[in-house]
């Protein structure tokens, strides 16, 4: 059964600290509304901006709510990633994950393979690849993943479904998740294992229903809902999706997630107003379809 995994937003206070209470409220709501797992410290959670201590703080807070967690530990200091992986032994979670070391250009494939194999060697949990070429500048594709040989699963954040399907073709025992919100109906229809969908932070009901309809082979209904979801995603990108996520969660779910962390700045009042104006018609349609409540 395909899963919907939420790369959970990290709420910050005005003075730039993690707001653990808001994080727990958000995690509780997501699990209650049918989200299968939470991906902690991902891009949507502003993971690259978090210190190792903050990454662990996020894990502890979410673990108070659920153990259905994939704990993202990656970064530019391998010692930090190793330490976080080892510390995760105290938590009965699904697994750890890491993106490729980013920023540094022209890293050899040999060194990238060594990075991930080192994490696999020390991890007390299954290890998931977080492949996000646009953000990291490195594509740990299906062939490289097979060479590394120790991944339980992959989150492939790329719009090309063939690229994602290749992981399953070359690594048939690997759990393969698309990182694209716009491919939920497609993924549920192809035999892949689900989506890690940023939009499920603010529209968990929609993402879960798209998956359900696609699994029931109600493809027309699934696509109708998928296209409404896509419109919200596209609206968020106009103003910067990482900042928009905070506004949209408050609008659709009714609770405040505080602030993002600069250089991901909060939207100003006018940007918020314009964003809400772009999605309020979609919300009305979702209410009419009885996906959302009034």
From Swiss-Prot:
A GO MF term: 2-dehydro-3-deoxy-phosphogluconate aldolase activity
Family that this chain belongs to: Belongs to the DapA family. KDPG aldolase subfamily.
E.C. numbers: 4.1.2.55
Subunit structure: Homotetramer; dimer of dimers.
Protein name: 2-dehydro-3-deoxy-phosphogluconate/2-dehydro-3-deoxy-6-phosphogalactonate aldolase
Magnesium listed as a keyword: no
Enzyme class: lyase
Reactions that this protein is recorded to catalyse: 2-dehydro-3-deoxy-6-phospho-D-gluconate = D-glyceraldehyde 3-phosphate + pyruvate; 2-dehydro-3-deoxy-6-phospho-D-galactonate = D-glyceraldehyde 3-phosphate + pyruvate
Organism name: Saccharolobus solfataricus
Active site as annotated: 155
Key word Lyase present: yes
Pathway entry: Carbohydrate acid metabolism; 2-dehydro-3-deoxy-D-gluconate degradation; D-glyceraldehyde 3-phosphate and pyruvate from 2-dehydro-3-deoxy-D-gluconate: step 2/2
PANTHER family registered for this protein in UniProt: 4-HYDROXY-2-OXOGLUTARATE ALDOLASE, MITOCHONDRIAL (PTHR12128:SF66), DIHYDRODIPICOLINATE SYNTHASE (PTHR12128)
Residues bound to substrate: 43-44, 130-132, 155-157
Pfam families, sorted: DHDPS
Other notes: The metabolic pathway in Sulfolobus species contrasts with the situation observed in other microorganisms where separate enzymes exist for the catabolism of the two sugars, glucose and galactose.
InterPro entries per record: Aldolase_TIM, DapA-like, ED_pathway_aldolase
Site features described as Proton shuttle, chain residue numbers: 130
Function per UniProt: Involved in the degradation of glucose and galactose via the Entner-Doudoroff pathway. Catalyzes the reversible cleavage of 2-keto-3-deoxy-6-phosphogluconate (KDPG) and 2-keto-3-deoxygluconate (KDG) forming pyruvate and glyceraldehyde 3-phosphate or glyceraldehyde, respectively. It is also able to catalyze the reversible cleavage of 2-keto-3-deoxy-6-phosphogalactonate (KDPGal) and 2-keto-3-deoxygalactonate (KDGal). It is equally active with both D- and L-glyceraldehyde.
SMART domains for this protein: DHDPS (SM01130)
Thermal dependence of function as given in the entry: Extremely thermostable.
Entries under NCBIfam families matching the protein: Arch_KDGaldase (NF040954)
């Amino acid at each position: 059964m395909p899963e919907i995994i939420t790369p959970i937003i990290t709420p910050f206070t005005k003075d730039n600290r993690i707001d653990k209470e808001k994080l727990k409220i958000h995690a509780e709501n997501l699990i209650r509304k049918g989200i299968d797992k939470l991906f902690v410290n991902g891009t949507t959670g502003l993971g690259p901006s978090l210190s190792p201590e903050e990454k662990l703080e996020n894990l502890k807070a979410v673990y108070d709510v659920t153990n259905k967690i994939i704990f993202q530990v990656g970064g530019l200091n391998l010692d930090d990633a190793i330490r976080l992986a080892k510390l995760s032994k105290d938590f009965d979670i699904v697994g750890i994950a890491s993106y490729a070391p980013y920023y540094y250009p022209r890293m050899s494939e040999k060194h990238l393979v060594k990075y991930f194999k080192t994490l696999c060697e020390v991890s007390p949990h299954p290890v998931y690849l977080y492949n996000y070429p646009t953000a990291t500048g490195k594509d740990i594709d299906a062939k490289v993943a097979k060479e590394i040989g120790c991944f339980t699963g992959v989150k492939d954040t790329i719009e090309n479904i063939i690229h994602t399907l290749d992981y399953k073709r070359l690594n048939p025992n690997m759990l393969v998740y698309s990182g694209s919100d716009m491919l939920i109906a497609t993924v549920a229809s192809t035999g892949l294992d689900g989506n890690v969908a940023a939009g499920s932070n603010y529209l968990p009901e929609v993402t879960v229903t798209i998956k359900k309809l696609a699994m029931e082979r109600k493809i027309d209904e699934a696509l109708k809902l998928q296209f409404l979801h896509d419109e919200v995603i596209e609206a968020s990108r106009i103003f910067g999706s990482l900042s928009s996520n905070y506004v949209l969660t408050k609008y659709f779910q009714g609770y405040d997630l505080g602030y993002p962390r600069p250089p991901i700045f909060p939207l100003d009042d006018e940007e918020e107003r314009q964003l809400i104006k772009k999605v309020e018609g979609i919300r009305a349609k979702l209410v009419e379809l009885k996906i959302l409540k009034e």
